[in-house]
């Protein structure tokens, strides 16, 4: 097994839902499959795994601790509680960039839908990065629609302060909801590996191995 006894891994997965009213919400197309694959592989390699789950496909992860976190605020609150207890974070969740300034108590009428006021959600990964300890490992994920997605991924890895970042080009809805992924994995030295339509478990295995090795560097 890659992880020594007692090593703890935190995984966020799925797409957050930001309530507009009792019926509607702001969401995205994330299925959570990548995060679930990572959680499965980390469990298989001996880690104690906690999953902060937003909206995902149905799943079963025997041995994992599952905490529902449907909104960005709920996920942020749990991240602040759980991060100090874990050796690594895989931030695979697709967190909404914005939320309604106010959740309406009754269903918004159609003629009022053009006047919804939004406010930015906090940047969860950047916030965690600023407060992590030196021996915690952070893995970020980015979805871009620009052909320069690798360049944008490099900039994001540096600005977020993460050890590893996987960036995908999701132009046209690619990757979301699929069992396969295409993208680029990078660390502080640049591109580690490029993936072209591989099963998400292939990426999960590579990421879990890289993180386990990084934890080993920190703790010997």
Task: Describe the residue ranges of each PLM region.
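Short, small-residue-biased leader/transition segments that mark boundaries at the very start
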Residues: 1-2
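Flexible, glycine/charged-enriched surface loops at secondary-structure junctions
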Residues: 6, 52, 217-220
């Amino acid at each position: 097994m890659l992880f020594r006894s007692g090593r703890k891994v935190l995984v966020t997965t799925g797409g957050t839902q930001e309530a507009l009213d009792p019926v509607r919400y702001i969401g995205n197309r994330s299925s959570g499959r990548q995060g679930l694959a990572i959680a499965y592989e980390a469990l298989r390699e001996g880690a104690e795994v906690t999953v902060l789950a937003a909206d995902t496909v149905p799943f079963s992860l025997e041995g994992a601790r599952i905490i529902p976190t449907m909104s960005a605020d709920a996920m942020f609150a749990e991240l602040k509680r759980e991060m100090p207890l874990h050796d690594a974070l895989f931030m695979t969740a697709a967190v909404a960039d914005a939320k309604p300034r106010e959740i309406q108590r009754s269903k918004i009428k159609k003629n009022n839908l053009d006047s919804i006021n939004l406010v930015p959600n906090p940047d969860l990964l950047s916030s965690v990065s600023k407060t992590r300890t030196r021996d915690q490992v952070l893995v970020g994920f980015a979805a871009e629609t620009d052909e320069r997605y690798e360049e944008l991924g490099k900039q994001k890895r540096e600005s977020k302060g993460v050890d590893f970042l996987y960036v995908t080009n999701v132009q046209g809805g690619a990757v979301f909801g699929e069992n396969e992924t295409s993208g680029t994995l990078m660390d502080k030295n640049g591109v580690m590996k490029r993936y072209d339509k591989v099963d998400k478990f292939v990426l999960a295995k590579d990421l879990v191995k890289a993180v386990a090795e990084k934890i080993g560097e920190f703790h010997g």
